[in-house]
Swiss-Prot record:
EC number: 7.1.1.-
Function: NDH shuttles electrons from NAD(P)H:plastoquinone, via FMN and iron-sulfur (Fe-S) centers, to quinones in the photosynthetic chain and possibly in a chloroplast respiratory chain. The immediate electron acceptor for the enzyme in this species is believed to be plastoquinone. Couples the redox reaction to proton translocation, and thus conserves the redox energy in a proton gradient.
Keyword NADP belongs to the record: yes
Organism field: Marchantia polymorpha (Common liverwort)
UniProt cross-references to InterPro entries, sorted A to Z: NADH_DH_suC, NADH_quin_OxRdtase_su_C/D-like, NADH_UbQ_OxRdtase_30kDa_su, NADH_UbQ_OxRdtase_CS
An annotated Gene Ontology molecular function: quinone binding
PANTHER family found in the cross-reference section: NADH DEHYDROGENASE [UBIQUINONE] IRON-SULFUR PROTEIN 3, MITOCHONDRIAL (PTHR10884:SF14), NADH DEHYDROGENASE UBIQUINONE IRON-SULFUR PROTEIN 3 (PTHR10884)
The protein's name in its UniProt record: NAD(P)H-quinone oxidoreductase subunit J, chloroplastic
Amino acid sequence: MLNILKNNNNKIQGRLSIWLIKHNLKHRPLGFDYQGIETLQIRSEDWPSLAVALYVYGFNYLRSQCAYDVEPGGLLASVYHFTKITDNADQPEEICIKIFILRKNPKIPSIFWVWKSADFQERESYDMFGIFYENHPCLKRILMPDSWLGWPLRKDYIVPNFYELQDAY
């Protein structure tokens, strides 16, 4: 599912991708988004070591983490946006990491232990999409009641039949 591109594809490789290749860290460059932010695809099993490498490289701020359903019955994706914040940076360096996983066993190692701000964001992705973040200290529903069945933002989710009691005014 993931191939490492060679150095002759520098058109879609940014500085971080070249640095990761130099240090033998597996990834797949996906190019740049409309704002010029480098996007990389990472395998779930490579994520813990790569997360630490990103932190060592200087990405000290997790700007956001989200998830989405690629297609009904297909893959789920967990997306991380990191920023390298320094004292004298007018234009901080940013990176986007995408991890695609099968919906049958959607497990990704948690990065809570590197960036504490991942706490509620990973919990929301768990609550809405059912992605299990391994080694998360408190992975439980955050928006839906604990009794809720299923993962409401998956494209194959079937809304349960229930009727709300309404006040008669």
